């Protein structure tokens, strides 16, 4: 099969490699669509730990074309969203509902390739009318669902989201399903601001605008925001967002921050206002339920452009620039 091998830094090479062998409880998936993720960019920039050479790609969908001997042949031909990790169900973390930190997790083979292998439990059948593009967003959507479910909402909650890239938009869609007050999205990119409005934001503001602080003060009100979601992965934006929370406010880190980064914030204020800070990493147990939930979200409009496998460098560069929404690879 053809695969894009990451060789370190921003170097990729298309190679012919053997199709992965499947174990008895596994399935072989023909990869149809792979989403480019900010983590893929961070890996090429040395901001996220990973060791080359390897096949990257973890947001993907496809069709089951072969099954192991312990898997019923009825699964051949099923259209699936693919979870890149599977948990053991037996370790301390799994038994305490922190399956994203499973001590014995098994990773599927990377998806920047024509085929990928995984346990049957990691291949979730998608709705009949769902496109492979939307199905490939199951992975980031499950991270956002797992994170937003950590929050306690009230029927008058005022929510601030900083960043309306894919993670910000997905968080927006999930919180708008709650019985809440309103959602404010802060985003400098005009295309992404427009997308946030189309996807349900009540207010959208430009942090580079002349009246930004004045507008934000009006929207936060006398007592501050109840919930803040940082969807960029920038420690300075995390600190800024926390400063706009009211007493007992809740902050959710959904953006991936660089390793060894620090939060420059007045800990007295954090303590005095009883702020609750949540780190959200991984998909929890939400992955299998996500395809049906996002079916009605209208996520097709988030796909900016699809590239062939040998155009991966262009797709990585455009993702890093942050001017589009979601770029896809079609192996």
Kindly give the residue locations of the regions a language model identified.
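C-terminal hydrophobic helical "lid"/dimerization subdomain
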Residues: 3, 239-243, 284-331
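NAD(P)H dinucleotide-binding glycine-rich loop of Rossmann-like/cofactor-binding domains
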Residues: 88-162
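Mid-domain Rossmann-like dinucleotide-binding core that forms the NAD(H)/NADP(H) cofactor-binding site
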Residues: 131-209
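Short amphipathic alpha-helix with an adjacent loop that forms part of the alpha/beta core around
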Residues: 211-222
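Short SAM/SAH-binding signature in class I
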Residues: 225-229
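Glycine-rich phosphate-binding loop and adjacent beta-alpha segment
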Residues: 235-296, 331
């Amino acid at each position: 099969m053809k695969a894009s091998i990451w060789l370190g830094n921003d170097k990729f090479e298309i190679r012919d490699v053997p199709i992965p062998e499947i174990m008895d409880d596994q399935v072989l998936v023909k990869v149809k669509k792979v989403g480019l993720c900010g983590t893929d960019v961070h890996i090429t920039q040395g901001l996220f730990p990973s060791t080359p050479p390897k096949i990257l790609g973890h947001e993907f969908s496809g069709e089951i074309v072969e099954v192991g001997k312990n898997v019923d042949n009825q699964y051949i031909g099923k259209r699936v969203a693919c979870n890149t990790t599977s948990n053991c169900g037996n370790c301390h973390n799994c038994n305490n509902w922190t399956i994203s930190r499973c001590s014995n997790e098994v990773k599927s083979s990377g998806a920047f390739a024509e085929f990928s292998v995984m346990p049957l439990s990691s291949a979730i059948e998608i709705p009949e009318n769902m496109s492979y593009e939307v199905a490939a967003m199951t992975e980031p959507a499950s991270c956002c669902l797992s994170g937003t479910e950590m929050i306690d909402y009230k029927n008058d909650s005022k929510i601030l989201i900083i960043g309306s890239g894919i993670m910000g938009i997905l968080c927006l869609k999930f919180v708008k399903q709650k019985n809440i007050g309103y959602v404010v999205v802060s985003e400098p990119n005009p295309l992404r601001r427009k997308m946030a409005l189309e996807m349900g934001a009540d207010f959208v503001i430009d942090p580079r605008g002349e009246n930004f602080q004045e507008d934000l003060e009006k929207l936060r009100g006398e007592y501050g925001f109840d919930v803040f979601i940082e969807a960029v992965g920038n420690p300075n934006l995390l600190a800024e967002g926390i400063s706009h929370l009211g007493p007992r406010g809740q902050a959710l880190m959904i953006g991936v921050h660089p390793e060894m980064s620090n939060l420059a914030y007045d800990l007295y204020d954090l303590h005095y206002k009883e702020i609750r800070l949540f780190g959200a990493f991984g998909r929890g147990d939400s992955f299998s339920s996500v395809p049906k939930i996002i079916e009605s979200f209208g996520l097709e409009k988030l796909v900016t452009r699809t590239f062939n496998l040998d155009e991966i460098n262009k797709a990585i560069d455009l993702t890093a620039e942050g001017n589009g929404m979601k770029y896809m690879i079609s192996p």
